[in-house]
Amino acid sequence: MFLRQEDFATVVRSTPLVSLDFIVENSRGEFLLGKRTNRPAQGYWFVPGGRVQKDETLEAAFERLTMAELGLRLPITAGQFYGVWQHFYDDNFSGTDFTTHYVVLGFRFRVAEEELLLPDEQHDDYRWLTPDALLASNDVHANSRAYFLAEKRAGVPGL
């Protein structure tokens, strides 16, 4: 369910949002990042993902979001659960008058690059970066870099 902008602003102002983030790896061990065109995190490189909608199962959200973000509909079983994360932003989708808080479920999976049809609605460019390269870049948002920090990986299988 998509809300009118005024209703969505009330939700964002009042409650955390639930989202899925995708830690997408190619065959060379590089990870997909898109340069965001919208708030929050506008102008930063960020892993793909998106919000879970009201009354939407996680399975349905995973399929909808992989299609919307990658052009490839994948079942939730394609991803390895990568933990629960918290993202806090000083701005929101419409400006800076209130903050945004996400509770994020991370999923990691590998894809064949040639199967992806990357959209341009929320990102104006895409890159594949190694963990070392993305950790070294201040253009990669701290919330995306956190998925690759050694101290964060300790309890998360896979990386």
From Swiss-Prot:
Cofactor annotation remark: Binds 1 Mg(2+) ion per subunit.
Known function: Hydrolyzes GDP-mannose.
Gene Ontology molecular function, alphabetical: GDP-mannose mannosyl hydrolase activity; magnesium ion binding; manganese ion binding
Domain Nudix hydrolase: 13-153
Renumbered ranges of motif Nudix box: 50-71
Gene3D superfamilies: Nucleoside Triphosphate Pyrophosphohydrolase
Residues holding Mg(2+): G49, E69, Q122
Protein origin, superkingdom: Bacteria
Cross-referenced InterPro entries: GDPMH, GDPMH_Gmm, NUDIX_hydrolase-like_dom_sf, NUDIX_hydrolase_CS, NUDIX_hydrolase_dom
Organism for this UniProt entry: Escherichia coli O157:H7
Cofactor: Mg(2+)
The protein, known as: GDP-mannose mannosyl hydrolase
